[in-house]
Amino acid sequence: LDGASQIAVPAFVSTLCICIVFVPIFFLSGTARFLFQPLAMAVIFAMLASYFLSRTVVPTMVRFLLREHLDEIDTSLAGGIQAPNGGEEKIDHRSRQERIERPRSASGRVLGFLSGIHEKFNHVFEKLRARYVNALRWCLEHRRIVFAGMGAMVLISLCLIPFLGRDFFPAVDAGQFRLHVRAPAGTRLESTQERFFQVGRAIREVVPPNEIQNVLDNIGLPTSGINLAFSDSSTISAADGEILVALNPNHKPTAQYVRILREKLHRDFPDMEFYFSAPDIVSQILNFGIPSPIDIQVTGRDPKGYDIANQIKARVAQIPGAVDVHVHQLVNGPDLRVNVDRTRAEQIGLTQSNVAQTMLISLSSSGQTAPNYWLNFQNGVNYQVAVQTPQYKVDTLQDLKNTPVVAPNLPRPELLGNLATVERRESPVIVNHYNVQPVFDVLANVQARDLGGVADEVSKVVDSFKSKLPRGTFLSMRGQVQSMNSSFAGLGAGLIFAIVLVYFLMVVNFQSWTDPFIIIMALPGALCGIIWMLFLSGTTLNVPSLMGAIMAIGVATANSILVVTFANDERCAHENKNSFDAALSAGFTRLRPVIMTALAMIIGMLPMSLGLGEGGEQNAPLGRAVIGGLLVATVTTLFFVPVVYSLLRKKEFTCDEDEEFARQEHGGTAEGGAQ
């Protein structure tokens, strides 16, 4: 009960600090909100449940399972150890040895073996703690050197931030790639198919046959009954299509094949256009349906918009790391323009709408305009019935003119050639709009560089064109870049907001502005550890790594609270103890719980940081950020926080009335309960 009551309030405040840092996650928007809100909720409820169990179940189990150990909890090694105040702590090792040798049964021998391991571990740990106390005493005696070293580490770490790079989410090896192939405008479907065969042979020259699971070609427009507005395909005519290559499980990195194919295909097929789009559902969601993560939109009704888009394309293609740069829309697609003679059509009872609907049904079937179903009474299944003119009957312009035009009030069909003239011309193959305005999209992928670095240079190119735009034309960047910037702004503000919330929570708990300031002195070390871990592991700064930073801040604050709280308790219990001795005692006593808490989190995050398994690369930055932050934050908590405490708490310490009453009630501080 003494041990549980002593750390009840510090443990509760530490738990709240870990929970509070996740509160800003609930104010995020976009994709990051849906990805990380479940994680935040899971951590919050798990921490609250663990605190409840640690206050109820754990003391009960200690009462019944550690009955023989209760008289030895506050002891160390046989022969004594050097306490931080210079005294010698002696223990009676005879009773413990007798208890180890007493049982002779199988279970007793196992317990004896485990007890022996425990004794050896304690022996090593006490040696470590003795060295730590000596190192901490040196730091307390040389505060200027410690502050200078801490400041230098923070400055060096801040200088590394520009070298980290920024990404929205880390790239995931999906085991497949999606290649879009576009032949010159007007290429017939048969010719496009032949070009696809040649591209397929080039792919098999790069990717070994034993690593290819299957290759799927989708040439031309989709022919399903689903409206094209709901299709994820970016094919726009018979001159282009997609090749989806799925790889076997044990394959080389997909990015390596993609890089080689980019160079080879552009070299072997200079008259064709190639770009790789997102193959997996996660990347497609992050791109919001756009084929590439970078989308520069030229919006406006001015006909010069397409020329501006091509000029931007030429500039962006020169940026290192920008690949697959292309203008999504084509404006030179061959088509046939049908000019209806409205006077002639009106004379025989037809309208331009009747002519357009007849041609649409004849060329594209009635499946979209007038769907009809036939019920098979034998099996009860409805079958869609569509009417369409066979392609071999409209191979020439004269065949198209011979298309019969019908209407409900027309006594007999009328040939299209009698109502309209047909002429050849060029027109846009695809027309896109954004906010009702026509738009041209300049799309770009990123290779061998971070998305943020490429996006910054693209933004400079876009800014250089804004002063040259015609009236009514606008430039904007969308896609994954826009989501990344908004998520970074939200998480960055959330990180600052979390620190402020934790600080004010501790102000309320400690009834002081100084103690919370001392506690958050562990946070610079956590941020330095995060930066160094990301830099050394080659990990970019992204949304998962920022989530890891938030988690590391919560745990580092919790450990720092334990140290400062114990130092205050020591000064309450011993009125004559100065801040130097209180900080030394706090480090000596809290070494074990601080290391245990940090190691538990680090070991738990280690498998995640390795990025093992399917899609493990996506969560690896989170684990690496937590591990790096806690490694340095633990050192900062054990060395720098006591130094700051000894400096800022030099004056006479005044105990809180509740703390003093609890101290008198329980008879002082129990070191075993702290551990």
What are these regions (language model features)?
Residues 5-7, 82-170, 213, 217, ...:
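Signature of alpha-helical transmembrane segments and their immediate interfacial
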Residues 26-35, 70, 147, 151-187, ...:
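Transmembrane helices with small-residue packing motifs
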Residues 96, 163-246, 258-263, 302-335, ...:
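Extracytoplasmic/periplasmic
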Residues 176-185, 226-249, 285-310, 334-346, ...:
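Short, hydrophobic beta-strand segments
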